[in-house]
Amino acid sequence: MKIVLATNNKDKVKEIKAFYDGYEIYALNEICEPFEIDETGSSFKENALIKATAVYAKLCALKLENEFIALSDDSGISVEALGFAPGIYSARYSGKDATDASNRKKLTCELHKLRLKKSGAFYTACIAVASKFGNFSTHGFMYGTVIDEERGDNGFGYDFMFMPDGFDGTIGQLDVKTKLAISHRSKGLELAKYILNSLEKYYK
């Protein structure tokens, strides 16, 4: 059984490959021409399933459904002081042409509008799997505090502003091994292993 990820995000691909080192994993652009997927869902789960099923439909069109499954991740940060924004809009928080840097800048500005330097926050990740045997999903969470400054140089997204509970530094200041052990995505991927292990025997 081979896995195609519903993303071309190099950081996500690298992180998922590191976690699932026993599986044969491909980025979307390694299997087919990249295509836009409209994330029209109202939750992380809905968006993750939209992405996974769209990629699986492409696999079926290429007659690869007996060889591959599709796996997607939809994740984001929810900040208590901001009414749990940006949530599902984390990747495009600062607008249509958002970048990680512009999103972090907007988050800092929103905190400062409230005269805050920090707030309770949590990350959510939904992992969705689409296969010829159906669609499945899991969730992972990481709780902590978001701060109004960036620290560290390891990670992406909002990692440099997020201090997980039990740690004195941000995710951006942690080594890769520690991040993989505690992250929301890793927790969701760990639960998804049960799905992958169950499916794998039918693809041999």
Curated annotation (Swiss-Prot):
Taxonomic lineage: Bacteria, Pseudomonadati, Campylobacterota, Epsilonproteobacteria, Campylobacterales
InterPro entries in alphabetical order: dITP/XTP_pyrophosphatase, ITPase-like_fam, RdgB/HAM1
Protein family per UniProt: Belongs to the HAM1 NTPase family.
Binding site for Mg(2+): D38, D74
Organism annotation: Campylobacter fetus subsp. fetus (strain 82-40)
The protein's name: dITP/XTP pyrophosphatase
Entry EC no(s): 3.6.1.66
Catalytic reaction equation(s): XTP + H2O = XMP + diphosphate + H(+); dITP + H2O = dIMP + diphosphate + H(+); ITP + H2O = IMP + diphosphate + H(+)
Cofactor note: Binds 1 Mg(2+) ion per subunit.
Group of enzyme by EC: hydrolase
